[in-house]
Amino acid sequence: MITQASIQIIDNANMVHELDTLFKPKSIAIIGASSKELSIGNVVIKNLIHYNYTGKIYPINLKESEIRGIKAYPTIFDVPEDIDLAHVIIPSKFVPQIIEDCGKKGIKSVIINSAGFSEMGEEGIALQEAFLAKAKEYGVRIFGPNCQGIINANPEYNAYCDFTFTFPKPGSISIVALSGGVGAFIMQSLFDLDIGMRMYASNGNACDISISEVLKYYGEDEGTKAIILYTEGFRNPREFIEAAKLVAKKKPILAMKSGRTEEGAQAAASHTGSLAGVDIATELIFEKTGILSFNNEEDMCQAAMAFSTQPIPKGNRVGIITNTGGPAVIATDELVSVGLQLPPLSQKAINILKETQLPEATIGNPIDVVATGGGIHFRSALDVLMNEENIDSIFINFVTAPFTDTDEVARNIVEVNRLKRKPIICNFMTNLSIDRFQTTAKILKDGGVPCYSFPTTAAKALGALYKFQKVQTRNIGEPKKFTDIDSSLSLPKGNGTFLPSSDVFKILSAYGILVADWRIAKNTDEAILYANEIGFPVVIKAEASSLVHKSDLGGVAINIKNAGEVKLAVDRMKLKFKNEELKFLVQKFLPGGKELIVGVTAQKELEPLIMFGLGGIYVEVLKDVIFKLSPVTELEAEEMLSSIKASKLLDGVRGQSGVNKKSIIEIIQRISQLVNDFPQIKEMDLNPIMAFEDKTIVVDARIKI
Amino acid sequence: MITQASIQIIDNANMVHELDTLFKPKSIAIIGASSKELSIGNVVIKNLIHYNYTGKIYPINLKESEIRGIKAYPTIFDVPEDIDLAHVIIPSKFVPQIIEDCGKKGIKSVIINSAGFSEMGEEGIALQEAFLAKAKEYGVRIFGPNCQGIINANPEYNAYCDFTFTFPKPGSISIVALSGGVGAFIMQSLFDLDIGMRMYASNGNACDISISEVLKYYGEDEGTKAIILYTEGFRNPREFIEAAKLVAKKKPILAMKSGRTEEGAQAAASHTGSLAGVDIATELIFEKTGILSFNNEEDMCQAAMAFSTQPIPKGNRVGIITNTGGPAVIATDELVSVGLQLPPLSQKAINILKETQLPEATIGNPIDVVATGGGIHFRSALDVLMNEENIDSIFINFVTAPFTDTDEVARNIVEVNRLKRKPIICNFMTNLSIDRFQTTAKILKDGGVPCYSFPTTAAKALGALYKFQKVQTRNIGEPKKFTDIDSSLSLPKGNGTFLPSSDVFKILSAYGILVADWRIAKNTDEAILYANEIGFPVVIKAEASSLVHKSDLGGVAINIKNAGEVKLAVDRMKLKFKNEELKFLVQKFLPGGKELIVGVTAQKELEPLIMFGLGGIYVEVLKDVIFKLSPVTELEAEEMLSSIKASKLLDGVRGQSGVNKKSIIEIIQRISQLVNDFPQIKEMDLNPIMAFEDKTIVVDARIKI
């Protein structure tokens, strides 16, 4: 019976995607094909042949009649059939004309390997714009320029449209990388680890087809099980967020962004040209969209090995089986560090193990089957852990002790691994130059057991599987839309200035945020009047558009207790600032709360970042702050409170009372709504906000528009 | 001319060391030799033969006349010649007798592979003590029991006294590991990286010959260039510190201590038995003695590769040469993260590079010679960096672009590397399954260039070389001996109690530490009298031996401004505590300083730890504290101040004044002297000490003896 679901799958499989001519070309023209060995125009053809490309190759060369044994044509117009994809490997100045030709010929996708465009200054930018205009006119999609190309390792295509030198076997990991150099060594690393690859894309200047578009394409590709992504920044971060949100929960995206130090970012700028948009926000984008972020490319590749064969664990509870002590200690350290737990075994499990293990074995978690333990001992431990309800994943340390039948151990691991019920990760310690152990390794490898050479590396890989489980189950929810906002509020256009305090407080009040009671006084008498209205003690702050860091300049007087002190403070400020427009902000003084900060930083091409942390002088001293990309949901705001280092302070310590966390969480969300409503806000600091047991009140704030 | 120095070296080389019979045995008896394949008593003989052991092998077996083709003897007494070393592979209960036999035969070193001793409870402990007594009586040194053994890869010996399966080629790295499993995979990892090994030792229960003793032996071995050490704790940390101090500045010691999480420590306890002594102090021991600490065993092995061939850089300034963009960005990030700097190139260097590099090259630091750059381009960049005064080391990213003569590039790198003037680390990105690139790799390998597969891994290795340079040049100096101490001070024996405040303050004063002026009052009148003497405002604290956490219990009244308030406070405390022996500590109230903490924790078998950090409630909330192992020198005390996260606070921020750091540094040193003078001090907290611009004063303190 054909069900609705199966129809959909069939439809999906037959659906033609715009990028199919790029990733699944039935025919490829190489414009700039060359008979010169080691030239890119020759290497690309050589690679297609070497990789057994299943489609047709059309070398385009004005003079040669054949290249590498394949008939060549003077121009694409001389090719008698349709062409899906063209490689362009000619000097940059000829590219606009060639793109027009491709359009006329009906070629849908073009990989421009040639350099000499936006990465080379004005002249190059003009050329890039010229060929892009032609591409738009004719509906040609451009991959590159200044790029490597793509690879599709699916045997149906074997499309090696690239000049690199690694020939991966087919698999389920797809790679997209901004840098060809990094993409290539990631591909090589998978190859060295004997992990198959699905697709590869390295798009250089990325003037048309973006990383985001490739990411979505991989997301829709049924053969792609996990994705590796490398970038140094995003030209269009919003587009990326959209794409990542679609894909990241369905398939693990393992990503690395370099240029995380100032020096690294400089090095990045020097080779990719200016990448507009985000820098520090990239990690926040990864977090928000559920991308697994790595800052070590080797860890990323090693984790990919686990994703390529293992199921995702249901939780963070791991059982360890080991036949050697020290490596289990190292593994335990790392497993715990990445958030996994080692629950004790059930009495039932202990009873079974006591009957089945050697007398020297240690029954517990880890289970030490000892070096003399054989296949049956590993098997009973594996079976026990597979049946333990409290265990979500299995970590194995397997050293090939010379006095055991290691093949038998491997066969038992493989049999249990085939069930695919819980992920199994194996730290396999052996000497592969010994034939006997090569056999053991092959049994594990063929049985789909991911094998690592170090306990820490293996533990990190299991940590990555668990992290993806958290990504899949984490639901940040939708940002709350507060409806008690004063909708009459309007803000002037951004002009790079700070708003007067009175405006700032009005804006906060309009958004339902508590502000310490305040008035603006023009003179001493008004200041005394207002102080009485507000109730002592008060704070007095000098107000003039030129004053920003008031407290550093002596423009703030705190804890004013009576009219006499008001007069003194006002007189002193008058004397100090001698400013015609000087006014005086009289505000309720609120000592004894915990000083916190909520801040906002606008981002080019991206939503503003919201910051929360310890306020007052501790902002600078401790930098104990957390950023999130807005809009911030309630769950995210809660996470901000619990992730600062001083989060204990909010709960109250040593007799001190805690704060009203709910009110802080609400302020963060209201600020998030405010800055999303008014994109002209460039910068905002509520510092400090005073958090009390019952409520939280803003006592100082500034807004730059 | 034979100088004094050269005589010493000759003497040293000929000197006979007690452990020579263990590491350089001329003859080995295998007591428990077996003809059974895969048994340890057979594998050890097989390994000795396979590794071409240069000495004589004497299998000892009551029944067999030969084992693996070698004449066997019923007992060691039947062996006609002297024996240097014996392997003991017999049931534990026979071991005491065999050790006595060994003693009688004049065997100086014994490796006990057999298990069944201290790791197996009381009976085992008794057996271990029994054979140890015999060993002492006859002057036999014991390695093990429950251990693997040793390996000496020096071709003069080829002594493979171990049952493992990795056969390293000779080299300059020596390994000592508590866990045989970890030792074995470290050895295997060096083998996989094609790094030679010098010596190997894994001593299991370590009942006699300790890791410390082996470490000293490696330190004196001229062929050992660097040492890898793995442990899960120390039985005798003082002995280890002595050994490490002797060796760590001469030769890099790369070390890893596992069991750093609670769960990991538990796992360690379950397989090594209880290791008395330190746990959290291990990192501090490593720091104090100059050991390079790793928490990732792969990083440690990769770093060893750099140490095995490269000189130590003179400083932290690195020049990068790359022929691909992205990997240079990744490398830059990591290099900067581990403390290296990328200085700009001199004008002279830039001029040379402009003349010698391709037009597409990026001239700067990194120098991007681009993928089409060949041998001459790499060479000119290398020569320039070798001659730059501001560059201490060279990092190379070398991808084997198919369109360049990669052998020529490799040859140029090797020629410059042979100079050994500055360390060269190479991230070599290639496909070793391609013959052409295998040749390139061999050129680099034979030329002693350490090659890595990932930029981050390579950068970490260079970071380790730099770290050793810091170790070699760091001189913490000797602990200062303050002579203005009141030498009449005495302390009772430790009894697990807290000293009364009056005693605590007297002790601090005796050690020249400023304490806020104080008196002990018996009643209200005395309290008022003393408050007047001290000067208001004061603090009043309830004093009785039963009161420890006074402030939590309402036993502290601060900011008392006059006699009336004194009376009120005293009356309230009387009512609250209803304690016959209740007294009242009247002390100067000192608001406005920065609250800091200095603390002490005693360690079993080791000097106490000194702690410094943010005081008051921030101790618990932020845990912004630094520990050092006492005695703490002036430099170390300075490091403590500069390494807390809030160190900026001490310098003063946003108009706030800084503190008198010198006075804090002195307090730390005086406390260090105090606890070294009085080992009965179990615990001490000066919390808070109030730091002002001019001085630092202790306002509260407790001491447990």
What feature does the model see in each segment?
Chain A
Residues 2-705:
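Catalytic-core regions of core metabolic enzymes
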